[in-house]
Amino acid sequence: MPELPEVETVRQGLAQWVTGRRIAEVEVRHPRAIRRHPAGAAHFADVLVGTTVRDVRRRGKYLWLPLDSGDAVIGHLGMSGQLLLQPGAAPDEAHLRVRFRFADDGPELRFVDQRTFGGLSVSAGGAEMPTEIAHIARDPLDPEFSEAAFVAALRRRRTEVKRALLDQTLLSGVGNIYADEALWRARLHGARPADGLTGPAALRLLGHVRDVLGEAIKEGGTSFDALYVNVNGESGYFDRALNVYGRADQPCRRCGTPVRREAFMNRSSYSCPRCQPRPRRALQASG
């Protein structure tokens, strides 16, 4: 699933190409793509046609497009969603779900989603902050993110530190890939109890999270397959710089010990057994 760097890369591309443009036509080609908009496809299109996109913003892994009507389009890419800018004459993608045409007859915006786990909806009056995503915490790169509040909240969590990093109510945008990478840099095993971290250790971990996210954004995110691309259909390149994620049995880039893969929440965690020894006290339940 796309994490903060991938979604931010898409946001930057959308901001460049759709800000200030007036929506002339909306075509919903698959109802599942707007399942979070209970009023249905006709209403979805009606409230958007004639509005102008003011900006493109992000909260964690969610995007939203504030409109001059005061409403907002909310988007989540899910596992395979893509927001692509295409010439109107370009052939339709096999999994095209929603199409936006603009009054200037320039490139159209297409929501393409093979697995249909992503989706779009309209938030009434949600231009400044859609209520549907207001509960999601700020991300570590947000200028208004509070380091002190994060450190205090993290150290109160009676759960494993990796589970805490994935909790979108604590901080948003961090998923499996970047949690593993930040923990490797911090020399912490993901099973380390969060409430056992010192304040300085928690702050150092946050610094590594920020560094990893920032570096990934510069590389356009991480692409392991053709499902994640930017608005121009281009893949990201941060996978070349990953230190542990997806590198099971390969040598740790720091000490040479083979990277270990462990089952984690129906996914996998990657760590170095030497640099990140598993703690003696490991919590199994989240809290």
From Swiss-Prot:
* Annotated PROSITE patterns: FPG_CAT, ZF_FPG_2
Q: What is its EC number?
A: 3.2.2.23, 4.2.99.18
List UniProt keywords, sorted A-Z. DNA damage, DNA repair, DNA-binding, Glycosidase, Hydrolase, Lyase, Metal-binding, Multifunctional enzyme, Zinc, Zinc-finger
Write down the required cofactor(s).
Answer: Zn(2+)
- Tell me which residue ranges form FPG-type zinc fingers: 243-277
InterPro entries hit by this protein: DNA_glyclase/AP_lyase_DNA-bd, Formamido-pyr_DNA_Glyclase, FPG_cat, MutM-like_N-ter, Ribosomal_uS13-like_H2TH, Znf_DNA_glyclase/AP_lyase, Znf_FPG/IleRS
Enumerate the Pfam families for this protein.
Fapy_DNA_glyco (PF01149), H2TH (PF06831), zf-FPG_IleRS (PF06827)
The free-text cofactor remark is: Binds 1 zinc ion per subunit.
| Gene Ontology annotations of biological process type | base-excision repair
Q: Where, in this chain's numbering, is DNA bound?
A: 95, 115, 157
Outline the subunit composition.
Answer: Monomer.
The name of this protein is Formamidopyrimidine-DNA glycosylase
Q: Which organism is it from?
A: Salinispora arenicola (strain CNS-205)
The root-end lineage is: Bacteria, Bacillati, Actinomycetota, Actinomycetes, Micromonosporales
